[in-house]
Amino acid sequence: MERREPTQKALVLAGGGARGSYQVGVWRALMELDWHPQIITGTSVGGLNGAMFVLDLYETARDMWLTIRSRDVMELPEENADLSALHQFLRRVVKEGGMDVTPLEEIVERVLDEDALRAAPIRFGIVTVEQRGLRPRELTLEDIPAGQVRDYLMASAACFPALRARQIDGVKFLDGGYSDNMPTGLAKTMGAEELVCVDLEGVGITLPNLTGLPTTMIRSYWELGDILHFDPDTAKRNMELGYYDTLRAFGRIRGCAYAVDSGADSSADAEAFRAAFDAVQKEVREKYPVTLTADAALLLARMKDAQLAPLEAAAEDAGVDPTHFYTTRTLAEAFLAACDKERMESFAPLFTGSSTAGQAALAALLPNTFLQALVWRTLTTSALPEVTEDEGL
């Protein structure tokens, strides 16, 4: 019997500046899932992260993202600069074609070993763009002259005009996002047969995936922050989101906005919750001409897990932290702890049949708050009897 070669798996890392910390969380999950690529392609920060992934420098990447700030990546004006000094700084940035990224270059110089990168078993490619004519350049390590890998990594991340173009052998290069922020085509050219793509929704051009290859797309439901604002707290949050989003993409957990246990007990609770929620909503509709308006319906529609959708939408609106792992029950407890109980109780007449027309109108005018009230009513009556308002996380 002929032995079949293993599927050539590729990890495709999009650009997105400071949002790149999200990709480190993805990497952590992929290692736990025992998913190992033979090919990695990246644009901009995706290329920088990808190089560290090729070198198996997870701890280095994690620690770097948890410590760097914007000032460690690019030259910035003094924090207490007066208006005159700020104007002078901005004039110089415009004159010099963007901010100086020497601090980032020093990090890349310290972290990345070109010889080790070339010797690694994972094939690696990046995208950059020649400034003249905006000519795209898709480059594998074999295409890059010896001693210039760091230069081309910096070129791929030269987010002009905010950052300076990178000059190599007399040619100026720009961020690869000017051509292809998600280099799936390059991955296929390098021999990929299966893709995992990590989208940061960064600026630039993201070409449609026309490879025809089996693809798992990983992107965050939540905002990941400004692309030029590097901050340890945001990085830590993004890593957790990336970790849980990857587990969800591979079917290990459920939910949409929140990481929810997919085990039997939690799933049974989710089924019971949704049935009870629908019953509460039906009861209110039968008493009053009040239903969820378009805004709240849209909020529910964004949630892909139908059973958990009302609970997740209410939890989001109440400000429940998305960086924790929950069961259906603990997510319910977190919502009850976070919601405005006085506001929730103000909707009680709608559920008891003693509401006025004004209260019904208020529910229609505040669809998200009314959705929270429906979830609150569901959880404090029959849905999950052991969950109480006093059990918040």
What residue spans do the PLM features occupy?
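Patatin-like phospholipase
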Residues: 1-43, 51-393
